[in-house]
Amino acid sequence: MKKLLFTCFVACCSLVLNAQEYYWTTYSFNVEASQVEAVEHLANEYFSKADSKAEGVTVYLFENHFRDNENDWSHQFAFTGTLDAMGEQYSRGENDSWELFLTKLGQYTKSHSAAAGNSLITIGEPGTHPIQNILWFDVEDASKFASAWKKYHSKFNPKDRRMTLGQFRLGRSPMGETHYALMGFNDFKTAFNAGAYRKGNKAAEKAWSEFIEEVDDIVTILRSNTRIMIGKW
């Protein structure tokens, strides 16, 4: 089943990625606040084992902190890696250790949704910023949007944050999202006012206005949420 799902995933991906870009899958679920510590313990116990995942795959556990009432999962596991690494991860087959982990996890959680996609343009180091704001887009002209996005952010993005433009491939919601922007921060102060660095910087302000004007008629923001990294293996 894992091999079949990954084959379908790859068949849906038509863009060639740069070496630093990555594929991802997410599994979102709900867990009561009183049981979060137990879930964290189970995840750490399992994913800390050397044979728990393929080489080159990183697993994250996130808390869905700020979200709308339809995007109402509480936590999420995310698997990321290169195409080869993720292909190996989803070709490993079932094993007793994995099944036992899922059984234990199911005692505390209720499944919500799952999705898959890939990054397109990443500025900064993925996986190093614990607070992540995510904007969900419906993009009509993907090539034009990506070009404008890269032009602005590659020049003006502050060095202490990570910016990724990516695309949803599988598990899209009825809202019809096609792309996302992930902004990684080290603290909430910066995350709360992500555009503060432009204040007083006339070049950045001008470039931002030009970027917005260029993409305004081809992009619709559908949703936003903030997730917090609480585990990484």
Regions found by a protein language model. Give the residues of each.
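Sec-dependent N-terminal signal peptides
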Residues: 3-17
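Short S/T/G/P-rich N-terminal loop/turn motif that feeds into the first structured element of a domain
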Residues: 19-233
